Design a protein with these regions (language model features):
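Conserved helicase ATPase core of P-loop NTP-dependent helicases/translocases
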Residues: 305-307, 315-316, 322-358
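Conserved interdomain hinge at the start of the Helicase C-terminal
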Residues: 281-309
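Conserved pre-motif I regulatory segment
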Residues: 8-48
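Walker A/P-loop
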Residues: 42-62
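Conserved helix-turn-beta segment of the N-terminal RecA-like "Helicase ATP-binding" lobe
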Residues: 81-104, 182-183
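Conserved Walker A/P-loop ATP-binding site and its immediately adjacent core
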Residues: 56-61, 71-92, 167-172, 309-311
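A conserved SF2-helicase RecA2
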Residues: 376-454
Length: 454
């Protein structure tokens, strides 16, 4: 073995464990076909594509290729209430998908279910698995996340699809890598990163922002990510035309609500400082904020989605908005699915729900009016807005953010996170674009340079 071959062998780059795609529907765009071909050839891959770029078509085409190659079955895991949408999208491709809630369907080739129902299924009955909106895996508790990862480990073909705001959470990238069998997130952290501080809590160790790249590892890290994942916000990120994928204008308006009474023990209203005071202010201004949100929702005759975070908010909003329907955590899965379906079909004008319930995976291009109660989570805000502001939306999307005076810092924090996420994704896409053109050269063994006078 030469020295160059020795160094080549030490590089950690994912290989191919798939096959050449034979099923590429004519309705796919060129970049979608390219991603299907790439993911099928990889066998185990991740696609980080922004909202509205057709991830459902991509994953269904990939799953059909696995079915035709292995004559086996593929399980498609999706967030709650997204299953019916996946089945509908499959019909557009001429594919028959079965929505199985309890693992009793044994003959269907393409099976759709929810993450929460994974325990009903046996991996021995499948040859491939798709995790739709895989970024929500980090929202599950450790037991559920471990069960999903262990289920995937037993299958030969694996695909992750998500439209996360920006894959700048290194832990999430490590979790994705572990799920598809490339490298565990603990191994990833020890190989490419070092802790910012030596003293950390166990909770801090699961926050990607507390790690930084080792001095030599950043380029190698993104080369490794490129070996099993593709990230894109628009087709041009992969060298294709953006003509059919133009986002409509987005108008964001902030509405600040003042409390009618000061905090207990105060003579006049003071800005909320810290999380505890912000929460107290939210509960104290519950009525005022809901009145403002209801006024905004009632001013539209078109569909509106109102995003809240507290149960009392949802209950009061439903009372203040005459034709509103609420989806809450205590609802049965069947009721959640039916309500989301009715809203998508236009049978419900105003939908009230929480981002953690309905902000992932659903397509609501028919709705262009959003009312949002902010929190510190940028991902929830991003995903909530992108249910409506996505490719395929024909109208200007209006987002009304209803906040208290004490939440100005929260909005500033969201803007800071948005700028950081945009910069991170810009850097990531640029690095991926460069890495796709990398030619491996021997830059370590060079000829000795001899002075010209010798």
């Amino acid at each position: 073995m030469s020295y160059a071959e020795f160094l080549e062998a030490k590089m950690h780059v994912g290989g191919n464990s798939g096959f050449k795609a034979t099923y590429l529907p004519d309705c796919l765009f060129d970049f979608q076909s390219a991603l299907v071909e790439w993911a099928t050839l990889k066998g185990r891959a991740a696609v980080f594509a922004d909202c509205g770029l057709g991830k459902t078509f991509i994953q269904l085409a990939w799953a059909e290729n696995v079915v035709r190659k292995t004559n086996g079955r593929v399980l498609i895991l999706a967030p709650l209430a997204v299953g019916f949408q996946t089945v509908t999208e499959g019909e557009k491709l001429g594919l028959k998908l079965t929505h199985d809630r309890d693992g009793t369907e044994k003959k269907a080739r393409l099976v759709v279910s929810n993450y929460e129902r994974l325990h009903y299924f046996d991996p021995k009955n499948f040859t491939g698995v798709v995790c739709d909106e895989s970024s929500i895996l980090k929202n599950f508790d450790g037991k559920t996340r471990l069960a999903i990862t262990q289920f995937m480990r037993k299958l030969q073909y694996r695909l992750l699809c998500t439209a996360t705001a920006a894959p700048n959470d290194y832990i999430e990238l490590g979790t994705s890598s572990e799920a598809i069998g490339e490298m565990g997130f603990s191994d990833m952290l020890s190989r490419f990163f070092k802790k910012v501080e030596r003293t950390m809590s166990r909770r801090d160790e699961h926050q990607g922002c507390n790690y930084r790249f080792r001095g030599h590892a950043e380029r190698d890290f993104w080369r490794w990510v490129c070996s099993w994942a593709r990230a894109m916000r628009r087709p041009s990120d992969l060298g294709y035309d953006d003509a059919a994928f133009r986002l409509p204008p987005l108008v964001v308006r902030d509405h600040f609500v003042k409390a009618n009474s000061p905090a207990p023990g105060m003579l006049f209203e003071m800005p909320a400082i810290g999380l505890q005071e912000q929460r107290e202010e939210l509960r104290r201004t519950l009525k005022e904020r809901c009145e403002q949100a209801a006024e905004l929702a009632n001013s539209h005759s078109n569909p509106v989605v109102v995003w809240c975070h507290l149960n009392p908010e949802g209950q009061l909003l439903k009372k203040m908005i005459p034709d509103a329907q609420e989806v809450k955590g205590s609802d049965t899965d069947e009721r959640k699915e039916s309500t989301f379906r009715d809203f998508a079909l236009g049978n419900i004008r105003v939908l009230v729900t929480k981002p953690k319930i309905g902000a992932f995976g659903l397509n609501w291009q028919h709705c262009s009016n959003v009312v949002y109660f902010p929190s510190h989570s940028y991902e929830q805000y991003y995903q909530a807005v992108r249910r409506c502001w996505r490719f395929g939306q024909r109208n200007t999307v209006k987002v009304d953010v209803v906040a208290t005076e004490g939440q100005r810092q929260v909005l500033d924090n969201l803007k800071r996170k948005a700028d950081a996420a945009s910069a991170m994704f810009e850097q990531l896409v640029g690095m991926m674009r460069n890495e796709l053109r990398i030619e491996r050269k021997n830059e370590f063994v060079k000829k000795e340079e001899v002075p010209t006078w010798l």
